[in-house]
Amino acid sequence: MSRMPRYKLTIEYDGAPFCGWQLQPALPSVQGALEAAALATCGEAVRVHGAGRTDAGVHALGQVAHVDIPKPFRADKLRDALNAHLRPNPVAVLAAEIVPDTFEARFSAVRRHYRYRIANRRSNLALDLGKVWRVPKPLDTDAMHRAAQVLIGKHNFTTFRDTECQAASPEKTLDVLDVIRDGDAVDIITNARSYLHSQVRSMVGSLVWVGEGRWTADDLAAALAARRRSACGPVAPPEGLYLMQVDY
């Protein structure tokens, strides 16, 4: 018997209405919305596997998933059918392609790219409410960028991971952590092969403390070296975080 065709999906979503990517009983999830759309499309229950298990409120412009569909579809037809059944959820399948059955959205990934958006202004948010973190106190983004380089490379990131994180090891290798300002918009760009639970938001919150003058780069280095969750700065809220792209 021939194997079911495997499809790679590229997905964007607004994370606000969801408990996160991962299925949870009686709660709306991105994975659940996609699996319901797949069931409506092919008539059978299937499992959709994501590259990144984003938390509640976190958005994606380039999440990747794979799914085995029990009957063959042309890739563009599958994309359109899933999108039709996803409405009115704020989830869109941007692309679908047939891939070998050895492809795994999570385990085949070699790099994940995240962007954290900050609005550094005193005024309330009108258009970007729920899409950025408004920080009213002026931020020294040059100091933030310099301090961020302390975290580049392979480290024990225990300080910057959630206490509920289930990763076997706290060691991760951070390839990029840049802080970029354009007017009152501050973007924190990072990429790595993988991250610990809440690692990006924990790093962002600590960098904001640097930007506000509460911490220096040495304080950030000391927090990293402490390998203790209580040494972390505040955890940035989820609404500013975006999974931008996954590389294979």
From Swiss-Prot:
EC number per UniProt: 5.4.99.12
Entry protein name: tRNA pseudouridine synthase A
GO molecular function, one term: RNA binding
Isomerase keyword on record: yes
The protein's role, per its UniProt record: Formation of pseudouridine at positions 38, 39 and 40 in the anticodon stem and loop of transfer RNAs.
Keyword tRNA processing included in the entry's annotation: yes
Database matches in PANTHER family: PSEUDOURIDYLATE SYNTHASE (PTHR11142), TRNA PSEUDOURIDINE SYNTHASE-LIKE 1 (PTHR11142:SF0)
Keyword annotations: Isomerase, tRNA processing
Subunit structure: Homodimer.
Protein residues bound to substrate: 114
Gene: truA
Catalysis performed (reactions): uridine(38/39/40) in tRNA = pseudouridine(38/39/40) in tRNA
Organism: Rhodopseudomonas palustris (strain ATCC BAA-98 / CGA009)
Gene Ontology BP terms: tRNA pseudouridine synthesis
Family stated for the protein in its record: Belongs to the tRNA pseudouridine synthase TruA family.
Entry-linked NCBIfam families: hisT_truA
Disulfide bond entries: none
InterPro entries for the chain: PsdUridine_synth_cat_dom_sf (IPR020103), PsdUridine_synth_TruA (IPR001406), PsdUridine_synth_TruA_a/b_dom (IPR020097), PsdUridine_synth_TruA_C (IPR020095), TruA/RsuA/RluB/E/F_N (IPR020094)
HAMAP family, sorted: TruA
Active-site residues, as the UniProt record annotates them: 55
Entry superkingdom: Bacteria
